[in-house]
Amino acid sequence: ALTFHQGRRIQVRSQESIIKEAELIIKDPDFKGYINDVGGPTANFRHPSCQKQLKVGTCKHRQCLFPSPCPRIDADHSDYIALLRKLRALPGVKKVFIRSGIRYDYLMEEKDGKFLDELCRYHVSGQLKIAPEHIAEPVLRHMGKPGKDVYLKFVRAFAKKNREIGKEQYLVPYFISSHPGCTLTHAIELAEFLRDTGRNPEQVQDFIPTPGSASTAMYYSGYDPFTGKKVYTVQNPHQKAMQRALMQYRNPRNRALVREALKEGGRTDLIGEDSRCLIRESNYRSRPQTIRRSKNK
C-alpha cells in the first residue's frame, strides 16, 4: 500500500529538513536529550535503488528486493549514516534512536557492514522492532516479503555485532496472523517457530484489509492479482481467532482455541507433556484439595 502513498520510488526528506526539525525539538523546554525515532516506512532505504533507476525510472515488471534482490541494487547507507552522525552532533542531543522501519533485507545487501555497526553502537535503545511478518514461505510470497532465511541471517548478524561491541540488545519481531495464503498449517508452523526461538509476543496483529494493497485484493477476490491463481483466505471470525491464538499459545485464555486449532490441523502431537508441545494434555493442572477448618476448632 505504500506505493499508493509514496509512489514506486522511495521518497525521502532532505537532511536539511530533518536537522531543522531536530533543532526545533531541542529548543523545547521538555526536551531531555533523546530523539526517539529517525525511522519511517523504509528507514534505511534512502538511496536510489540503482543507476538505471536514475536514468529511466523504476522497472515496470520487477521489484528491487522481491522475490530476491536485483543484481543491480546499490545498497548504500552512506547518506543515512551521515544524517545520523549530524543529528548526534547537535548540541543538547544525548541519543538518537531508530525504533522502527529498518528494512533488514536491504541492510543485508550492504557489502561493508558499516550501517549495522553504526546501528548497533548508537541507535538501538535496547530493542529494535523489525517486521518479518511470518516465517512460512508460501505466506511470505503472498506478502511480498523476503524468505525466512533472510530474517534468520539478519538475526545472527545482529547478535554477532552486539557481542563484538559488548552490548545486550534485542530484536522485537512483528508477525501477522490470517494473512491471505495463511492456512492453519502455516499458523501452526509460526507457533512452533515462536516456541523454538523463545518468543512470547504480548501483542499480535490480525490481518486487516486496507484499501490499495495487493493483500486486500487477495482477501476479497480469493485470487493472486499477479499470478491469477487462487489464494486461501480466512473469512470466518472463529478461524481467524484460532490463528491469532496460536501466536499466543502460552496465554491460558487461548488454550481452548489452540487445542481446537491443533486438532483441526492434524497436529495433536503438539498436545501433551513433552517440551515441544504447545499446550498440556489437560487444560488446567490438577490442584491439591485443601481442607478448610472452622475458626472455632
Language model features with spans:
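Radical SAM enzyme core and accessory elements
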Residues: 211-297
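A generic structural motif
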Residues: 172, 201-209, 273-275
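Radical SAM enzyme [4Fe-4S]-AdoMet core and its adjacent flexible, acidic
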Residues: 49-78, 142-143, 148-149, 195, ...
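Conserved catalytic-core segments centered on acid/base and nucleophilic motifs
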Residues: 7-9, 18, 24-26, 193-194
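Conserved, mostly hydrophobic/aromatic
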Residues: 18, 130, 158, 204, ...
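Canonical Radical SAM [4Fe-4S] cluster-binding loop centered on the CxxxCxxC motif
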Residues: 1-13
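Conserved SAM/AdoMet-binding glycine-rich loop
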Residues: 24-172, 176-180
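Catalytic cores of alpha/beta
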Residues: 114-115, 179-196
